[in-house]
Each structure stands twice: as C-alpha cells, then as structure tokens.
Curated annotation (Swiss-Prot):
Pfam families: eIF-1a (PF01176). This is Translation initiation factor IF-1, chloroplastic. Belongs to the IF-1 family. It comes from the Eukaryota. PANTHER family: TRANSLATION INITIATION FACTOR IF-1, CHLOROPLASTIC (PTHR33370:SF1). Residues 26-101 form the S1-like domain. Component of the 30S ribosomal translation pre-initiation complex which assembles on the 30S ribosome in the order IF-2 and IF-3, IF-1 and N-formylmethionyl-tRNA(fMet); mRNA recruitment can occur at any time during PIC assembly. The keyword RNA-binding applies. Residues 1-35 are annotated as: Disordered. CDD domains: S1_IF1. Residues 1-10 have a biased composition (Polar residues). One of its GO terms (molecular function) is translation initiation factor activity. It is found in: Plastid, Chloroplast.
C-alpha cells in the first residue's frame, strides 16, 4: 500500500511556469517604455510645479516636473527649452524630464 502512494512536491508542476516567468525576452517587453519624448518651450508657469508647454509640433500641453527634477531643485522658468514625456493614452498631459541649457 505504501508503494502506491506518490509524494507530491509543490514545485513539481510549476517548473514550466517558472521558465515562462524568467524568460528574458518577456521581461524586456514588459519593461519597455511606451512614452513619447518631445521637446517643447515653457510658455506659462502654473501652480504646484505645473507648466503650460508649446511642443515643437505646435501643440500646447500641460506638463508637471518629474521626481528627479524636484529632488535636485532644478528651477524651470518661462522660456526654458525642456524635454517632455507624453503618454500615448493622454497626449494633453506630460512629464518634464530634462531642462536644456
């Protein structure tokens, strides 16, 4: 009777699943950014670190400061040329990621 019992290990059925999770090509696809980088000019200074920007293609968007710019206390004033990340889901809002000199 003891010969008929088969021990079941909890990791036995998950070997194939772990190979799929650790597949490097799938991880690259997940981490790939879906943002659009554009350059623009600051036209207005709004409250709470938000700015009205005119992009190089003529579209006006509202952009907020990225965390690194806030941490390093980089000042952005009207007339500065900046790089903006736009989400493909809402092209009217963006994140300011770099101030050009």
């Amino acid at each position: 009777m003891n010969q008929l019992k088969k021990s079941f290990s909890p990791t036995e059925g998950k070997k194939d699943q772990n190979n799929l999770i650790n597949d490097p090509q799938k991880n690259k696809q997940k981490k790939q950014k879906k943002l659009v980088d554009m350059e623009g000019l600051v036209t207005h200074n709004l409250s709470n670190g938000k700015f009205r920007l005119k992009l190089e293609n003529g579209v006006e968007v509202i952009g907020h400061l990225s965390g690194k710019i806030r941490q390093n206390r980089i000042k952005i004033v009207v007339g500065d040329k900046v790089t903006v990340e736009l989400s493909p889901y809402d092209l009217t809002k963006g994140r300011i990621t770099y101030r050009h000199r």
